[in-house]
Design a protein with these regions (language model features):
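The feature marks the mature, well-folded catalytic cores of soluble enzymes
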Residues: 1-273
Length: 273
């Protein structure tokens, strides 16, 4: 079994400095001490389960650099860098590109004019790339990736602005298994998932709003935000070990466990061979 490797960024400059999704409100900002404590707990939980965590250097003025999942898409030693829809996040790209270039990855960019927000909207389940579009990423970017990688890509239209990235409402657990929140997808998208993923564990609406689907999967361990008891029960029935880590300070910005991490060696659910 390969050693799991995950990229994270300490929340030294994290805060609610702008509003680019329905979760964010500058009038209800984050508490730095609580954010640091919650991030540290997630970090320690992952390390305690055998993960090697690589760290980005935080940058002043880039509060969302902490959400490394949006840096880009990793495929073997290729890194497809994100083109963010919002300028306030586009300033993160040079730092992510520099990190990946310095750590042995070939950094690539999608064609100009195509918005693409990385592993936030592009998740492998088996050999298939499931791709969220409309709110942040463009469907054209996923078509491009499918051609370059030689992989089947299944576009999924996101229709609920509170679930603006695919990783907020869909979490592959293993090839053919995933958590999802049906209410984030249109009828066609729900049908696509039901057809192509053998086992789907639906998240209750209240737990979906706790970002229960925004989970980190390491083998049979699934790390979620707190307040997702029914989802945890379903995971245990499937043979997984759910672990709850309070991440409410990051929910204020529309993020949770998965948003705070980027797998560098391929998700356990991904089949790249």
């Amino acid at each position: 079994m390969r050693q799991p490797r995950i990229l994270m960024c300490p929340p030294d400059y994290y805060g609610i400095e702008y509003e680019i999704n329905p979760w964010m409100s500058r009038s209800h900002g984050s508490t730095p001490e609580r954010a640091h404590g919650q991030w540290r707990k997630l970090y320690e939980t992952l390390v305690g389960h055998g993960v090697t965590v690589e760290l980005m250097t935080p940058q002043k003025g880039l509060p969302d650099l902490v959400f490394t999942a949006n840096a880009g898409l990793v495929f073997e030693k290729l890194f497809f860098s994100s083109t963010f829809r919002h300028e306030v996040r586009a300033r993160e790209t040079p730092y992510f590109d520099a990190w990946f270039g310095a750590h042995g990855f070939e950094v690539r960019h999608l064609p100009k004019g195509i918005y693409f927000e990385g592993a936030g909207d592009a998740l492998f389940c088996g050999p298939t790339l499931y791709a969220g579009y409309r709110i942040r990423s463009d469907v054209g970017g996923h078509q491009y990736l499918g051609k370059v990688l030689g992989r089947q890509v299944l576009p999924l239209e996101l229709v609920n602005p509170r679930f603006y990235h695919l990783d907020t409402c869909f979490c592959p657990l293993a090839p053919g298994e995933a958590i999802y929140f049906p209410g984030a997808f249109d009828t066609y998208g729900q049908k696509v998932l039901e057809t192509h993923v053998k086992r789907l564990l639906p998240a209750p609406e209240n737990e979906a709003h706790r970002f229960g689907c925004n989970a980190v999967v390491v083998g049979k361990t699934v790390v979620t935000n707190t307040g997702c008891e029914r989802l945890a029960e379903g995971l245990r029935e499937w043979g997984y070990e759910p672990i709850a880590v309070e991440l409410d300070e990051f929910l204020k910005a529309g993020g949770s466990a998965k948003c705070l991490t980027l797998r560098l060696d391929g998700e356990d659910a991904a089949v790249w061979e």
